């Protein structure tokens, strides 16, 4: 299967739709923000007209106040693959959320359910004795502790939760996970200045399209500004503006700045995929890129066994 990824504003959406039109394929979104309802403009969702041209999966599937894990994404992605293949079409993954991509190509462990009472107890211990949870993690699973930043309390609590409930080291459990299947990752690239210009243009277009009104609507619906869904670039800055903390010009510039920083982090993350195919959109034409990726998708379709029912959906 094929994953098309790249930093925000690089051109994933338009390119993926063009490829799907050529190949009678459908898109499975790999975006941790586009899955939320009522958050269209700020997340850069494909328009309704684009979604009529090509069917998209895993967009608008949960409300902003619903919990949605990487593991749930993996399960939903598998169901989407089954549905698309059953109807004789090709699934094309597109999006820029690195953890979601990892859950597909490397697998993810989510063997124990969330235990809110246990988490509350752990956080109380941390409040009473700052650093105690980090010390616990270093003692029970030093391998995992080396991979979790000392100030990352959220992941530390999750690791301890897994250990307490499973009686096994999280690092050992993670070694047992398997990828969903065989994936070819295609990374779209643009020269930095060109990418930043596209980001600045996109942010301007978002505000012109009514981002502030979209944020007002979310507030009217009763959604807290502290929700994970609303801790999204574009929304947090807009909320600050609506609260009188930023003027409009400063808000727009801050969204541009934060989006550029986010794109830089995405580029660094994608370097992890050593076997990925890089398509440079700054040096090749849009048409050539569509044709090149379409050929890759077709070759994958012809040689991957899962299209013939040989795919494992564990």
UniProtKB/Swiss-Prot annotation:
Belongs to the IPP transferase family. This is tRNA dimethylallyltransferase. Monomer. Pfam families: IPPT (PF01715). Substrate binds at residues 8-13. The record marks 97 as: Interaction with substrate tRNA. Its EC number is 2.5.1.75. The lineage of its organism: Bacteria, Thermotogati, Thermotogota, Thermotogae, Thermotogales. Keywords: ATP-binding, Magnesium, Nucleotide-binding, Transferase, tRNA processing. ATP binds at residues 6-13. GO terms for biological process: tRNA modification. Its cofactor is Mg(2+). One of its GO terms (molecular function) is ATP binding. It catalyses: adenosine(37) in tRNA + dimethylallyl diphosphate = N(6)-dimethylallyladenosine(37) in tRNA + diphosphate. Residues 31-34 are annotated as: Interaction with substrate tRNA.
């Amino acid at each position: 299967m094929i994953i098309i990824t790249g930093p925000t504003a690089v051109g994933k959406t338009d390119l993926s739709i063009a490829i799907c039109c050529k190949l009678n394929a459908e898109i499975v979104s790999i975006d941790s923000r586009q899955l939320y309802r009522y958050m269209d403009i700020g997340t850069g969702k494909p328009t309704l007209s684009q979604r009529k041209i090509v069917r998209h999966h895993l967009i608008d599937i949960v409300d902003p106040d619903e919990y949605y894990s990487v593991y749930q994404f993996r399960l939903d992605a598998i169901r989407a693959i089954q549905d698309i293949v059953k109807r004789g079409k090709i699934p094309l993954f597109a999006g820029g959320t690195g953890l979601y991509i990892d859950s597909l190509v490397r697998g993810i462990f989510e063997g124990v359910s969330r235990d809110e009472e246990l988490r509350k107890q752990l956080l109380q211990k941390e409040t009473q004795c700052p650093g105690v949870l980090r010390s616990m993690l270093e003692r029970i699973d030093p391998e995992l502790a080396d991979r979790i930043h000392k100030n990352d309390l959220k992941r530390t609590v999750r690791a301890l939760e897994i250990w307490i409930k499973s009686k096994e080291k999280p690092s050992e459990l993670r070694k047992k996970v398997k990828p969903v299947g065989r994936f070819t990752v295609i990374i779209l690239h643009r020269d930095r200045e060109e990418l930043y210009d596209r980001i600045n243009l996109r942010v301007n277009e978002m505000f012109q399209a009514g981002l502030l009104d979209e944020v007002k609507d979310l507030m009217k619906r009763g959604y807290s500004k502290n929700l994970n869904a609303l801790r999204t670039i574009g929304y947090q800055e807009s909320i600050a503006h609506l609260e009188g903390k930023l003027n409009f010009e400063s808000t727009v510039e801050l969204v541009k700045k934060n989006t550029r920083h986010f794109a830089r982090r995405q580029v660094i993350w994608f370097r992890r995929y050593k076997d990925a195919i890089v398509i440079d959109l700054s040096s090749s034409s849009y048409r050539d890129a569509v044709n090149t990726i379409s050929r890759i998708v077709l070759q994958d379709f012809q040689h991957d066994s899962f299209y013939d029912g040989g795919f494992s959906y564990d």
